[in-house]
Design a protein with these regions (language model features):
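Short alpha-helices
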Residues: 124-128
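Alpha-helix C-terminal capping segments
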Residues: 112-113, 131-134
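Class I S-adenosyl-L-methionine
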Residues: 1-19, 24-123
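Short Asp/Glu-rich motifs
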Residues: 49, 129-130
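Residue-level detector of conserved catalytic or cofactor/ligand-binding positions
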Residues: 133-141
Length: 141
């Protein structure tokens, strides 16, 4: 397979929790994907509200303490394997791909395999969750 046949892997941050806080770009990448690797965090349980999942291969790569756990090396292998097969791959993560998300490790593994990535960050909870608290409060002039 030539590199022209390899699609960039989309690394998508799902935002701070609720399924409808994902970005429009993230939702579009999920709609275009043929294979989606998901965590147990973020919008993964409501994926069917973001795209038609009937023709997609969904791979649960959750890391749960004392339960099922996929190693990061195995996740990297799956991303590379599906991308090299010419499939459109999305990696959906809860929150932001790089804040405790090990996104850099995935980008690095893909780069070592000469597979391009597209990073679609999630909305940061500090500025997105309507908690009624200001992001910055200065009470003195």
């Amino acid at each position: 397979m030539t590199s022209a046949q390899i699609h960039p892997v989309s690394l998508i941050g799902g935002g701070p929790g609720a399924w409808d806080l994902i970005t429009v770009r993230g939702m579009r990448a999920l709609q275009e994907a043929e294979v989606i690797l998901t965590d147990h965090l973020g919008p993964a349980p409501q994926l069917d509200k973001l795209c038609d999942i009937s023709a997609k291969e969904l791979i649960d790569v959750s890391k749960l303490p004392y339960k099922k756990s996929i190693t990061q090396d195995k996740i990297n292998e799956l991303l590379i394997e599906h991308a090299q097969a010419g499939r459109k791959v999305a990696r959906l993560k809860g929150g932001d791909p790089f804040v405790f998300g090990r996104g850099f490790e995935e980008v690095q593994a893909l780069a070592q395999a000469s597979i391009p990535t597209t990073v679609i960050p999630g909305v940061t909870s500090a500025i997105s969750v309507p908690a009624g608290l200001p992001l910055i409060h200065i009470s003195k002039p």
